From Swiss-Prot:
Removes 5-oxoproline from various penultimate amino acid residues except L-proline. Keywords: Cytoplasm, Hydrolase, Protease, Thiol protease. PROSITE patterns: PYRASE_CYS (PS01334), PYRASE_GLU (PS01333). This is Pyrrolidone-carboxylate peptidase. One of its GO terms (molecular function) is pyroglutamyl-peptidase activity. It comes from Streptomyces coelicolor (strain ATCC BAA-471 / A3(2) / M145).
Amino acid sequence: MTRVLITGFAPFGGERVNPSWQAASLVAAEPPAGLAVTAAELPCVFGESLDALRDAIRADNPDLVLCLGQAGGRPGVTVERVGINVDDARIPDNAGGQPIDEPVVPDGPAAYFSTLPVKACVAAMREAGVPAAVSNTAGTFVCNHVAYGLGHLIATEFPHLRGGFAHVPWAPEQVPDGTAPALPPATVAHGLRALLAAAARTPAEQDLKVTEGATH
């Protein structure tokens, strides 16, 4: 049975909830067939988030890791193609830290690509009826910090792992006036189950050869 670690973040930026953790918890409570899923909540703090991720990987010894974060304003689940080696925080993290133009890992490579089949994951979510897309930027806040940091952990400490990052939209309770896109965490979790099933059966090098690019 494939062992999966799925992570979400604590609320940040004045929010009372974080839909990434809500969805991760739902997936762990009702995992896809053939997968053993454990969920871990990461602090929305530079540095500490990667320490918590490393500890969770060591504790659970997963085969596959999916880290989640909140991307308010995006209309669907977006699977990140790449994490880049820069922290450039527009707002402080939950500990008050606000690094500007600092590397996630000093002297690390410029970027790490996801080792999940990002296009197959997107296709699986769409087939499950959940809006999804490939994203080419995870931002430069703690989400990208973890997306890049996970790639570095895989490259340097856990070479048996495959892993990647996905962003989820706001939950409806975060936009009660309906002025921005939102998805219920249960809907997101339904899509993530399809994503994980696709990731477990599809090596990254056998990803779908379909267009999911962007012109800008």
